[in-house]
Amino acid sequence: DTSISEEAKLTIADSSYITVGSGGSIEELDETRYRVPHTLFVANSDSSPAANLEVSLELQTTEVIVGDSWTYLEGWLAPVSTTDCTVGPDTDELYSSATIVPSGDTDSGENSGSVQVITDDQGYADFDVIYPRSLGSWSRVEVLASADVGDLYPSRASLDFTLPVPSEILTEESTVPFQTSPFGEEGDTDCSNI
């Protein structure tokens, strides 16, 4: 029947996709801090790079680890006598363990949990996660990236990881640096103080 006529309005929005990653390298920033370089890539729905796009980055501590590392005759073992304690949004600031900054920024000032970066013409933006050496292997964090495409279509991505310790320390040291978690010893493994 050709007398039936209907009309449907569609809204077509450009969509973007974010990928967050790291090359796995750890740099000694100074005598007290490590820096882990990261990058993000944003692609449009047609897979072309999303150039000059502002991306918001947020860093949250999701877990702290309490307990001790073990030492034996040939070296030391990664933390084994431990408990992972979840850090909720209401206590994240109390256990904030790292700072997120644009790549190359070493003057992070206050412990910053958020930053904005702009993608280059290839859709990439670099940033660093900086943290005290004493927290390596004792804290788990999550990087959240988001970018708005239009008013209703935010794109999001995340990456979570345990703050790493350089492999040279793992192989060269006969005793573990920072053997006891700064968040609590083996006897405190019930997470009641977290």
Predicted regions and their residues:
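Short, hydrophobic beta-strand segments
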Residues: 1, 104-108, 115-121, 125-135
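Short S/T/G/P-enriched beta-strand
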Residues: 1-56, 60-99, 133-134, 138-142, ...
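Short, small/polar residue-rich loop motifs at catalytic or cofactor-binding pockets
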Residues: 35-36, 111-113
